[in-house]
Amino acid sequence: MMNHPHSSHIGTTNVKEEIGKLDRIRISGIGLIAYAFMAVLLIIAISTKTLPNTMIGAIFALVLMGHVFYYLGAHLPIFRSYLGGGSVFTILLTAILVATNVIPKYVVTTASGFINGMDFLGLYIVSLIASSLFKMDRKMLLKAAVRFLPVAFISMALTAVVIGIVGVIIGVGFNYAILYIAMPIMAGGVGAGIVPLSGIYAHAMGVGSAGILSKLFPTVILGNLLAIISAGLISRIFKDSKGNGHGEILRGEREKSAAAEEIKPDYVQLGVGLIIAVMFFMIGTMLNKVFPGINAYAFIILSIVLTKAFGLLPKYYEDSVIMFGQVIVKNMTHALLAGVGLSLLDMHVLLAALSWQFVVLCLVSIVAISLISATLGKLFGLYPVEAAITAGLANNSMGGTGNVAVLAASERMNLIAFAQMGNRIGGALILVVAGILVTFMK
């Protein structure tokens, strides 16, 4: 019996329709068919060890993993609602895949080399800081900074006291709770936080810093993870609350900033924005060499705030920076989250350190700093939700990458400058205070 030509035509049409349907599912702008092809390519490259140990290899792996894991986390019911959505899911899943050796160590080295070695993280953060600060109204920026910093610093001090008191109650002692939970969790991450902190402790105690670092590291990991989850929860629970600024930090300023015009992308200006952002990074780095006691990011933020306050940069350049920042955020945030999970979240170290007292103290830190910063934020004229996230939870996170994850989970990326401000300046203060305290508490 002969096949009717019309039926084969219908079959082909149906297949095309099905493919069309699948391709309409978009993962960060990429159709599912194209994504599946690239994912297979990545799996083959990793398993045959042909993934280049270069920027190209890192971008291919991190972007593909980051986008798909974020998409899954943003659509899974429990993660979406209670566990920080795509941000936490991406970080956790990549960390678990590394811990179970599904992702080989050489891929971790490639990813870490790109993010930390070549300092893509630095480019990402400076682009984000510059774009979010230049986007703000000049008067509003200065008003917000003056109110924000006291909230961040007082919150950190009061939280440390609360942690110490709870330490006494649960039997680990005031000194231990302060030195091994409060200080590392608020020190501003790993490189600028617990690494110098371990050196300070080692010098005062007359021991090696490696042993102390392994004691401090789990605190930063768990604190960071809890901060990300809490940021997602707070923004979700208080979605319709009057205390929610929906991304604006200063009370009563929401209506003003909503009227800000949308900047149309321009290819040449994108390149201009890149080099202006990098210029501010260089200013911060060079000033840090002259004054090594002050973190480079503190100088970067200060130089941008002063440039904005005195109107030193023409609007064309400001718009260019804003434009470039948007491109980086929209395309590379998920990749960066995957990089955090691959290279910074060591599940073995975290699980080995888990005791009920340790978990309780980390939880106390999160709850205390959220409540205190929200309350103080309200008193100082900030939106409590934004204050809790930027002046509170960001100061319990893993520095730059932690800030990105906390703000991604709460969908408040535009507040990166405030998160960095509290984290970097607050972290530096913590190191100074820890240096004094450790001599009495050791």
Curated annotation (Swiss-Prot):
Q: Which superkingdom? A: Bacteria
Keywords from the UniProt entry: Antiport, Cell membrane, Citrate utilization, Membrane, Plasmid, Stress response, Symport, Transmembrane, Transmembrane helix, Transport
Catalyses which reaction(s): (R)-lactate(in) + citrate(out) = (R)-lactate(out) + citrate(in); (S)-lactate(in) + citrate(out) = (S)-lactate(out) + citrate(in); citrate(in) + H(+)(in) = citrate(out) + H(+)(out)
Gene Ontology molecular functions: antiporter activity; organic anion transmembrane transporter activity; symporter activity
Q: How does it sit in the membrane?
A: Multi-pass membrane protein
Query: According to the record, what induces this protein's expression?
Result: Constitutively expressed at neutral pH values. Expression is increased at low pH. Magni et al show that expression is not affected when L.lactis is grown on M17 medium with or without supplementation of citrate. However, it was shown later that transcription is higher in the presence of citrate. Expression is also induced by amino acid limitation. Expression of the cit cluster is controlled at the post-transcriptional level by mRNA processing at a putative complex secondary structure and by translational repression mediated by the CitR regulatory protein.
Q: How is its activity regulated?
A: The transport of citrate is unaffected by the presence of citrate in the growth media.
Instruction: Give the InterPro entries listed for this entry.
Output: 2-OHcarbox_trans_Prot/Firm, 2-OHcarboxylate_transport
Q: Does the keyword Mitochondrion apply?
A: no
Q: Which Pfam families match?
A: 2HCT
Tell me the compartments it is located in.
Answer: Cell membrane
Q: Is Transmembrane helix one of the keywords?
A: yes
* Biological process (GO), any one: citrate metabolic process
Membrane-crossing residue ranges in chain numbering = 27-47, 59-79, 83-103, 114-134, 151-171, 177-197, 209-229, 267-287, 293-313, 321-341, 349-369, 387-409, 421-441
A single GO cellular-component term on record: plasma membrane
Function per UniProt? Secondary transporter involved in citrate metabolism. During cometabolism of citrate and glucose, catalyzes the uptake of divalent citrate into the cell coupled to the exit of monovalent lactate, the end product of glycolysis in L.lactis. The citrate/lactate exchange is electrogenic and results in the generation of a membrane potential. Plays an important role in resistance against lactate toxicity at low pH. In the absence of glucose, i.e.
Regarding protein family, the annotation reads: Belongs to the 2-hydroxycarboxylate transporter (2-HCT) (TC 2.A.24) family.
For this entry, the protein name equals Citrate transporter CitP
